[in-house]
From Swiss-Prot:
Membrane-spanning intervals of the chain: 16-36, 53-73, 91-111, 139-159, 164-184, 195-213, 227-247, 253-273, 285-305, 310-330, 350-370, 372-392
UniProt-listed NCBIfam families: PRK11195.1
Gene designation per UniProt: lplT
Keywords: Cell inner membrane, Cell membrane, Lipid transport, Membrane, Transmembrane, Transmembrane helix, Transport
Protein's cellular compartments: Cell inner membrane
Gene3D superfamilies: MFS general substrate transporter like domains
Name of the protein described by the UniProt record: Lysophospholipid transporter LplT
């Protein structure tokens, strides 16, 4: 479809609505299953440091499959790719439901998620264009975060009530996501005819990595989103251990409610980014990134539920405002160079490598007995410094470009 035809289409087209609905149910299942599975391993008396390992098993699938999923997304109609990926998530949820190893089942969900991600973001560049792409990303993030909000709370609350029901609901939601994918219009493959030999695919993927990392704006986006999502997933597990220490509450529901506050904030921040940031003004998001780290450090010192809620909402608002423009920038740069699916696969490699490293470090410091409040403060300070360095680096690159 031509760029002009895309620009003339309303943002909330039939295809866009179908994509948003499918994404909502898929993300709902992901987040409900995470907290239900955390409750399961807690019930089975696994040690505290094993909780991040669950997410690391999930994340590792993204890294292993990174060379292949971008081409998979670009070689077939992306709506059908999303449907197959949700089917794999359903299979993983059933593995956990029927009492098999939860780490194995959650890894299978990770395989589905790895295949799903390039397709869900890549399809936005095929059904929207230009400045509508930033708005579409804002809507996608809002749909995702609404699902995180409801899914996280549902997973924790249902697990406190009946763990078997919680796991069954997760499987049902994935089944609904599979059905929702059937309503996405079938679009032509973005890049059909590529080689399916593993060696050629791996070479093609790392070529795409080099192309994007040599592009200044794409590199800036990749670094920013990797830091953000690495920190975001670590914060989720920090909350699980922080709540009993700082608030004296030991149920499964409270950490999910606190995670939901971040989700509410990200919805607001994503909306603000769609309203106030364009592809030409992406750098406006950087101060929000620094403030995320400051807010996390302050949050870790709290012992009051109302202040915890307020600070987590603020962290979410800053996060949404920070990450949405960076996603849109990468999709635009990727679509014009290596393909949107490959660009998102490269992004996933960066983000999940950051997650794996941060979760691994978090697991180590917990195992070593470092107080969780100290971990939270240190985590916030390091994140703020990392984004400040990214900001300074980008400013320097811009000055050099202007001088030339």
């Amino acid at each position: 479809m031509s760029q002009q035809a895309l620009a003339d289409k309303p943002l909330l087209s039939r295809g866009m609505i179908a994509v948003l609905c499918a994404q909502f149910f898929s993300a709902f299942g992901d987040n409900a299953l995470l907290f239900a599975t955390l409750a399961l391993i807690k019930q089975q008396l696994y040690p505290d440091w094993s909780q991040p390992i669950l997410q690391m098993a999930f994340v590792a699938t993204y890294i292993v499959l990174a060379p292949f999923v971008g081409q998979f997304a670009d070689s077939f109609a992306k709506g059908r790719v999303m449907m197959v990926a949700n089917g794999l998530k359903l299979a993983g949820a059933l593995v956990i439901c029927f009492g098999f190893n939860p780490f194995l089942g959650y890894s299978l969900v990770g395989v589905g998620a790895a295949a799903y991600s390039p397709a869900k973001y890549g399809i936005l560049g095929e059904i929207t264009s230009g400045e509508q792409l930033v708005k579409a990303n804002g809507m996608m993030e809002a749909s995702t975060i609404a699902a995180i909000l409801l899914g996280s709370v549902a997973g924790g609350v249902l697990a406190d009530w009946h763990l078997g029901v919680a796991l069954g609901v997760c499987a049902l939601v994935y089944a609904i996501a599979v059905v929702a994918n059937m309503f996405i219009p079938k679009l032509a493959a973005a890049r059909s005819g590529s080689s399916w030999r593993p060696r050629a695919m791996t070479g093609s993927f790392f070529t795409a990595c080099l192309v994007l990392w040599r592009d200044g704006e794409a590199r800036f986006s990749l670094a920013g989103t990797s830091l953000f999502w690495g920190a975001g997933v670590t914060l989720r597990f920090l909350l699980v251990l922080w709540v009993p220490i700082a608030l004296g509450i030991t149920d499964n529901a409270t950490p999910t409610l606190l995670n939901a506050m971040v989700a509410i904030g990200i919805v607001v921040g994503a909306g603000a980014a769609a309203r106030f940031v364009t592809l030409k003004t992406v750098k406006r998001c950087l101060p929000a990134g620094v403030l995320i780290g400051v807010a996390v450090a302050i949050f870790a010192l709290q012992h009051s539920m109302p202040m915890a809620y307020l600070l987590l909402i603020i962290i979410g608002i800053l996060g949404g405002f920070f990450v949405v423009p960076l996603n849109a920038l990468l999709q635009e740069r990727g679509k014009n160079s290596v393909g949107a699916g490959n660009a998102i696969a490269v992004q996933n490699l960066g983000e999940n490598t950051a997650m794996l490293l941060m979760l691994g470090l978090f697991s180590v410091v917990v195992k070593l007995g470092v107080p969780v409040i100290a971990v939270g403060v240190g985590f916030g300070v390091i994140f703020a410094l990392a984004i400040a360095l990214l900001w300074g680096w980008q400013w320097r690159q811009q000055r050099q470009k202007t001088a030339e």
